[in-house]
A protein has these predicted regions:
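Conserved alpha/beta core of the MobA/IspD/sugar-nucleotide pyrophosphorylase nucleotidyltransferase superfamily
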Residues: 1-3, 167-238
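N-terminal nucleotide-binding beta1-loop-alpha1 segment
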Residues: 1-17, 208
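Conserved N-terminal catalytic core of the sugar/cofactor nucleotidyltransferase
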Residues: 2-5, 29-99
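Phosphate- and divalent-cation-binding pockets in alpha/beta enzyme and binding domains
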Residues: 13, 57-60, 85, 112-113, ...
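Conserved beta-strand segments of alpha/beta enzyme cores
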Residues: 22, 72-74, 155, 208-210
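Short beta-strand-to-loop acidic/aromatic patch adjacent to the donor-nucleotide binding site
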Residues: 98-108
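Conserved core of the sugar-phosphate nucleotidyltransferase
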Residues: 110-188
Length: 238
């Protein structure tokens, strides 16, 4: 299984701690090292990392970790890293011809989420999003999290940070297909912003966006200093 890791953004909310954000340390290791190691533990064998802001610094570290881990890792540069994150997924298009994992460089998670997401996902969906139904999860920043409205059959109805009616959170862990890339391109062509969520919305409108409930397992979006402090102090972040 191949994983695409989005690591292109500026990470302005963590800049006072370190830059670029994927190299900010959590428990003695850079964020992106946690993501790569946890994906490896879940059975991922190849990586495509989309870089952008401070790409040279990040790519130097990634070359080191690829050599140390003995894994196949390719970097793809997204010069439009200030644009919505869906364009980083589009940048990886030449290297994803089939189903792939889509991960965020600043999201930490229990590796078993990936294993079960792959094993239990419906084949008729173009995308499956790992969701957290714990609306009181103390690890979640309610002011920043992407919210999801999930139908009874597990399909996504709506997704976005501004939703007022929702029953789950987006964990930033996806099992995707090239259909997501087509959906993002379609969104841009029709005047949309081209975010991942906008691509998911287009798939959802066709009944092609499903979900996987992670239960009570750990995940956190390390997007600011407060989240970094939570990640440093949670036992599962090793």
């Amino acid at each position: 299984m191949r994983a695409v890791i989005i690591a292109a953004g500026q990470g302005s909310r963590l800049r006072e701690v370190g830059s670029p954000k994927p190299l900010v340390q959590v428990r003695g290791r850079p964020l992106i090292a946690h993501v790569i190691d946890d994906a490896l533990a879940a059975g991922v064998t190849e990586f495509v990392v989309v870089t952008g802001y401070e790409a040279a610094k990040l790519e130097c570290f990634l070359a080191e970790i690829a050599g140390a881990r003995g894994v196949q890792l390719r970097c793809v540069h997204n010069p439009a890293f200030l644009s919505p994150n869906g364009l980083s997924v589009v940048a990886a298009a030449p290297f994803v011809e089939e189903r792939f994992l889509l991960l965020m460089a600043d999201h930490l998670f229990d590796p078993s989420i990936i294993q079960d997401l792959i094993a239990g996902s419906p084949r008729d969906a173009e995308l499956v999003l790992a969701i957290d139904r714990r609306l009181d999860n103390p690890m979640v920043d309610l002011d920043d999290v992407t919210r999801v409205d999930v139908a009874q059959d597990g399909r996504i109805r709506r997704i976005g940070k501004a939703l007022t009616k929702y029953n789950a959170f987006d964990t930033g862990i996806f099992l995707a297909s090239p259909g997501l890339i087509r959906a993002v391109r379609e969104d841009v062509a029709q005047g949309g912003g081209g975010s991942i969520s906008e691509g998911v919305l287009r798939l959802a409108a066709r009944g092609l966006a499903a979900t996987y409930d992670i239960g009570d397992r750990f995940w956190i979006d390390v997007d600011d200093a407060a989240a970094l402090n939570r990640a440093e102090n949670i036992q599962v972040c090793k």
